[in-house]
Swiss-Prot record:
The gene is atpA. InterPro entries: ATP_synth_asu-like_sf, ATP_synth_asu_C, ATP_synth_asu_C_sf, ATP_synth_F1_a_nt-bd_dom, ATP_synth_F1_asu, ATPase_a/bsu_AS, ATPase_F1/V1/A1_a/bsu_N, ATPase_F1/V1/A1_a/bsu_N_sf. Pfam families: ATP-synt_ab, ATP-synt_ab_C, ATP-synt_ab_N. Belongs to the ATPase alpha/beta chains family. This is ATP synthase subunit alpha. Its main location: membrane. It is found in: Cell inner membrane. The record marks S371 as: Required for activity. One of its GO terms (molecular function) is ATP binding. It comes from Paracoccus denitrificans (strain Pd 1222).
């Protein structure tokens, strides 16, 4: 049998042409050392900072340190399953998380994997976790209210959509309670687009908390129906530090989906102190030089680049917004520590909670003197602005006078009146947990307090009086509340007469 040269050359040419098409090109490296959630890897020369890499067994990691001879990788999982000499593969992708309305009602981890046992997410898109914040031109100043349902906050420290308002205080002062009540309060407004109210989608990020605490919170949200418009991102105390560091960024990417598509979202970081601690742990293990309180030099940038992503966009960019309520835990009321001062300077105001007030029974324990909202007054409703003005001033004068009144008993009538009014207003600002009020209810209650309707009521009965008033309004004056909710206007003229009539009507039944 003769060998045909042409046939052989055709086969060879074909094989050369198709050579290597099926071969998978993957850049791999080798683990040099591993421990404490950090792996040192040799051989990943072209890897990007922030890129995902894959270890054997499907464990993922993220590249943080790029050095001359190796790269430092933080591991999103158990480092006990990784050993020296293991192969590490590049994925070519920066850390991404799922985003979209499919995440509402779900509990996910820092990488967006569902942990609530309700099946896969089927999210409509994926977004990079750590992206640049919007520039100056796409933004608009904050002008729409974001109601928390808490009298002391909505009247004196108002928050607007697109604002960053810090909640700061010691442990066990009710920081999470304020955030949770804000989520629950949105049930009064969500789904009412016909009345000109945009739905506020909520994202709650639990960083370094106990699993039992997160489970209780999710249970409360489900019981009240608030889970329908809420996503919970959990990186609990037992999760590795890289997960606690990443969770706020991942959750913000999920919130940006709403912001960039012309919708409104609220994100609660609970809390950023623990994220800073997780980042400090990672940085020290990666041998980055420590700075003040052993935090790395870029810990300010850690929080500033996160919180700058919360913004109100202008009409040309869809008019969406992302509002942030970061929480910071202080030690013994020290707000001059490193992380608290950093976050205070980044945010647009703070709600300051005090242990002393909490134990006096003033809950929410808001110190109205130290709390401030730098942009919120522009976002207050007209009705609230017209009645809430005198409250902060009267309470400030009351606190000042109360300090003097301890020394002398012979007070003139004007001072005595101020003290009596202040004591009743302080009592009026108290509010039980899980019972947020609508804007209209708060306006009427505060109007009653500032116009002297409470002056004849004993201080101990103020809470009872207010509870009765709310019941009366909901049962007898529901149309007034509805009208105030739909048509926001200054409390004057007809509206003021209607409120006075309602209060006079209640006064007769209370007597």
């Amino acid at each position: 049998m003769g060998i045909q040269a042409a046939e052989i050359s055709a086969i060879l040419k074909d094989q050369i042409k198709n050579f290597g098409q099926d071969a998978e090109v993957a850049e791999v490296g080798q683990v040099l050392s591993v421990g404490d959630g950090i792996a040192r890897v040799y051989g990943l020369d072209k890897v990007q900072a922030g890129e995902m890499v894959e270890f054997p067994g499907g464990i993922r990691g993220m590249v943080l340190n790029l050095e001359t001879d190796n790269v430092g990788v933080v591991i999103f999982g158990d480092d006990r399953d990784i050993k020296e000499g293991d192969t590490v593969k590049r994925t070519g992708a920066i850390v991404e998380v799922p985003a979209g309305k499919e995440l509402l009602g779900r509990v996910v981890d820092a990488l967006g994997n569902p942990i609530d046992g309700k099946g896969p997410l089927n999210a409509s898109e994926r977004r990079i976790a750590d992206v640049k914040a919007p520039g100056i031109m796409p933004r608009k100043s904050v002008h729409e209210p974001m109601a928390t349902g808490l009298k002391s906050v909505d009247a004196m420290i108002p928050v607007g959509r697109g604002q960053r308002e810090l909640i700061i205080g010691d442990r066990q002062t009710g920081k999470t309670a304020i955030a949770l009540d804000t989520i629950l309060n949105q049930a009064n407004y969500n789904g009412r687009e016909a009345d000109g109210m945009k739905t506020l989608h909520c994202i709650y990020v639990a960083v370094g908390q106990k699993r039992s605490t997160v489970a209780q919170l999710v249970k409360k949200l489900e019981e009240t129906g608030a889970m329908a418009y809420t996503t919970v991102v959990a990186a609990t105390a037992s999760d590795p530090a890289p997960m606690q560091y990443l969770a706020p960024y991942s959750a913000t990417a999920m919130g940006e989906y709403f912001r960039d598509n012309g919708m409104d979202a609220l994100i609660i970081y609970d809390d950023l102190s623990k994220q800073a601690v997780a980042y400090r742990q990672m940085s020290l293990l990666l041998r980055r030089p420590p700075g003040r309180e052993a935090y790395p030099g870029d810990v300010f940038y850690l929080h500033s680049r996160l919180l700058e992503r919360s913004a109100k966009l202008n009409e040309a960019n869809g008019a969406g917004s992302l509002t942030a309520l970061p929480i910071i835990e202080t030690q013994a009321g020290d707000v001059s520590a490193y992380i608290p001062t950093n976050v205070i300077s980044i945010t647009d105001g703070q709600i300051f909670l005090e242990t002393e007030l909490f134990f006096q029974g003033i809950r929410p324990a808001v110190n109205t003197g130290l709390s401030v909202s730098r942009v919120g007054s522009a976002a207050q409703t007209k009705a609230m602005k017209s009645v809430a003005g005198p409250v902060k001033l009267e309470l400030a004068q009351y606190r000042e006078m109360a300090a003097f009144a301890q020394f002398g008993s012979d007070l003139d009538a004007a001072t005595q009146k101020l003290l009596n009014r202040g004591a009743r207003l302080t009592e009026l600002m108290k509010q039980p947990q899980y019972s947020p009020l609508t804007n209209a209810e708060i306006v009427i209650v505060i109007y009653a307090g500032t116009k002297g309707y409470l002056d004849g009521i004993p201080v101990r009965d103020v809470t009872k009086w207010e509870h009765g008033l709310l019941q009366y309004l909901r049962n007898q004056k529901a149309d007034l509340l509805e009208d105030m909710t739909k048509n926001d206007r200054k409390v004057a003229g007809e509206l003021e007469d209607a409120i006075k009539a309602a209060l006079d009507g209640y006064a007769k039944t209370y007597a």
